């Protein structure tokens, strides 16, 4: 059972500008809660929050809490895992005896308030929850949405809908998703990651089992071997076979810019649809979203038109612009499996001659920023294998995400291993983002697809190129 959230109780977010925190703040302010927050950065998100009525201060000091207390407010104070116990705001809030909620406590409370779909899994959570939200919006359901990315049809990561359903992204990185009790839990896949939190794959599997145990119903991807072995859902979906599964979306034609597929329920064909997204992984994400909507009783006929409107969230194969004849694409891929799938999709655009760009790209220049020293060390061989699938490769320095450096773990180490596996691949390692930008300028060619991947600040490449 989640912690009770009283109507119109004031709430203060430490780090309100984060993608997960800002989504919650938008929901609460729309529902009448006095909402405030702090974030040291001045960003478009903080400006948007202020326009919605959230009080935002751009510092994190004890004075922020003192001001709230002097105004007679004793807010619930919300923190994420990223906020250290040494944070001065958090220390003062504890000293004042204020209620301290983890972000997951607040999300759990909102999930409990209405029929909810919680989307979990190692990869594809944001895309699948975005596609689920889009299908429900296009079907006239107007769901509440709390997503870890910008949903194109909403222009936001948080939406306080007026329909009966809530769609939430359930992040497994810190294990807090076990607090959620949704009506439907959707699990996209499972693979070892977040080794800074989990002791190993078994630990991660046990956490996902606990999440599944807390759901009224579970929908899972049968194409994932780990889920197939360790999870017992109420329903399966697949994109490889319609046999033995409750839902399937089988590809009839895969192109560099779209996919024609046939949807099945209990082995029987229901209808064909055109998915305006390339890649088998995107078809799987869409199949999971379709299956979830069907389990919530939405007729396929009301969903099929929405399929043509599907767009991925921000930073998921996101065309930022064209620079001197090069297509600059930003993607959040930061795990070897994500990198492998994203590069395969990009190569399909090059080889098939079909792409979402004005003309098909002729070469693939991959740019990768490793995320966390611990992840780079754990998956060095897998990254080296995945990153070979390009015509030229540029590596940015490891984005630490607050971690201390590890001896011998750096982008040059990764480059050396890739070169051993593929000696003829052109590779360069940048010293910083400015150097990376210069390398893109000098090593790319007209009609190149420049694909920047990573969960850090590598998305700063496009502003530097276009400046």
From Swiss-Prot:
Gene Ontology MF: a single term: ATP binding
GO-annotated biological processes: cell division; cell wall organization; peptidoglycan biosynthetic process; regulation of cell shape
UniProt pathway annotation: Cell wall biogenesis; peptidoglycan biosynthesis
Keyword Nucleotide-binding: yes
Entry's EC annotation: 6.3.2.8
Primary residence: cytoplasm
Ligase is among the record's keywords: yes
Subcellular location: Cytoplasm
GO cellular component, one term: cytoplasm
InterPro entries cross-referenced by the UniProt entry: Mur-like_cat_sf, Mur_ligase_C, Mur_ligase_C_dom_sf, Mur_ligase_cen, Mur_ligase_N, MurCDEF_pg_biosynth, UDP-N-AcMur_Ala_ligase_MurC
Keywords from the UniProt entry: ATP-binding, Cell cycle, Cell division, Cell shape, Cell wall biogenesis/degradation, Cytoplasm, Ligase, Nucleotide-binding, Peptidoglycan synthesis
Positions contributing to ATP binding: 121-127
Reaction catalysed by this enzyme: UDP-N-acetyl-alpha-D-muramate + L-alanine + ATP = UDP-N-acetyl-alpha-D-muramoyl-L-alanine + ADP + phosphate + H(+)
Enzyme kind, highest EC tier: ligase
PANTHER family assigned to the protein according to its UniProt record, in alphabetical order: UDP-N-ACETYLMURAMATE--L-ALANINE LIGASE, UDP-N-ACETYLMURAMATE--L-ALANINE LIGASE-RELATED
Family: Belongs to the MurCDEF family.
Free-text function comment from the UniProt entry: Cell wall formation.
Protein name per Swiss-Prot or TrEMBL: UDP-N-acetylmuramate--L-alanine ligase
Biological source species: Parasynechococcus marenigrum (strain WH8102)
């Amino acid at each position: 059972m989640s912690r009770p959230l009283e109507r119109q109780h004031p709430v203060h977010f430490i780090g309100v500008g984060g993608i997960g925190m800002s989504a919650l703040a938008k929901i609460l302010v729309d529902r009448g809660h006095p909402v405030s927050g702090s974030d040291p950065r001045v960003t478009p998100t903080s400006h948007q929050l202020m326009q919605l009525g959230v009080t935002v201060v751009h510092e994190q000091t004890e004075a922020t809490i003192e001001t709230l207390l002097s105004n007679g407010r004793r807010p619930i104070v919300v923190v994420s895992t990223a906020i250290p116990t040494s944070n001065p705001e958090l220390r003062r809030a504890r000293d004042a005896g204020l209620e301290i909620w983890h972000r997951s406590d607040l999300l759990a409370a909102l999930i409990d308030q209405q029929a909810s779909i919680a989307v979990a899994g190692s990869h594809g959570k944001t895309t699948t929850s975005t596609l689920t939200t889009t299908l429900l919006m296009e079907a006239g359901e107007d769901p509440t949405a709390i997503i870890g990315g910008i949903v194109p049809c909403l222009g936001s990561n948080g939406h306080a809908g007026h329909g009966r359903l809530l769609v939430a992204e359930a992040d497994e990185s810190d294990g807090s998703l076990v607090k959620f009790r949704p009506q439907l839990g959707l699990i996209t896949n499972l693979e070892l990651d977040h080794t800074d939190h989990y002791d190993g794959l078994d630990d991660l599997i046990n956490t996902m089992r606990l999440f599944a145990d807390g759901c009224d119903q579970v929908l899972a991807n049968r194409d994932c071997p780990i889920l197939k072995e360790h999870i017992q859902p109420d329903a399966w979906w697949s994109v490889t076979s319609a046999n033995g599964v409750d839902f399937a979306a089988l590809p009839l034609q895969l192109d560099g810019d779209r996919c024609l597929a046939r949807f099945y329920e209990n082995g029987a064909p229901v209808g064909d649809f055109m998915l305006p997204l390339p890649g088998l992984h995107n078809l799987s994400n869409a199949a999971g979203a379709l299956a979830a909507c069907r389990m919530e009783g939405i007729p396929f006929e009301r969903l099929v038109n929405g399929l043509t409107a599907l767009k991925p969230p921000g930073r998921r194969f996101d065309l930022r612009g064209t620079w001197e004849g090069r297509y600059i694409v930003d993607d959040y891929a930061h795990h070897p499996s994500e990198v492998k799938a994203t590069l395969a999709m990009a190569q399909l655009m090059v080889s098939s001659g079909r792409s979402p760009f004005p003309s098909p790209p002729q070469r693939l220049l991959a740019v990768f920023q490793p995320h966390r020293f611990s992840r780079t060390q754990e998956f060095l061989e897998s990254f080296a294998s995945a990153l070979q699938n390009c015509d030229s490769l540029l590596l940015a320095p490891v984005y630490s995400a607050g971690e201390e450096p590890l001896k011998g773990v750096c982008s040059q180490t990764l480059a050396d291993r890739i070169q051993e596996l593929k000696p003829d691949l052109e590779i360069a390692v940048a010293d910083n983002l400015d150097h990376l930008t210069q390398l893109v300028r000098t090593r790319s060619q007209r009609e190149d697809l420049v694909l920047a991947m990573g969960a850090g600040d590598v998305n700063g490449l496009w502003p530097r190129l276009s400046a």
